Amino acid sequence: MAYYGANVNAFLYMGTSTATPLPAPGADSFTVVPLLGSVTPPANELTTAFFNILNDGDRRSVGGKLNDRTSEGNLVADWTSVIHQAMEADSIVPGGRKRNWYIVYPDAGARRDDFVAFISTWTKEAFDAGEDAKEHRVNFTLTVDGAVTVTY
């Protein structure tokens, strides 16, 4: 099967375990998410606060904790794919079904971001029979629970 992500060699992998607690990534088995169109790695964004000091014209700022971290992407829907079926099923579990996930970067250093996340958004795009019709896609958001571990 051809993977859409192959054009840049960036891939998203989904862990098979949904146990509580989840196993360490090295003890889980993973499957590549097929027909991946795009994936955005989780961002690092700190909360910030501002304050003023009396008789000082400059505003001061301080950084806090990491904001919510998400990974957004889309895929070409293949409803015969067990992975796509599992992702859709996970998206309607109250409280979120957490899994291990990782993204492999397309760089020579083979960077890998490991994280625990649940599917918080699963949106099927509109069917479009217009001149510029494209494959039916699904947009998704993975909400990270905890830290993102980077390995090379």
Model-derived segments and spans:
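Short, acidic/charged, Gly/Pro-enriched secondary-structure junctions
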Residues: 80-118
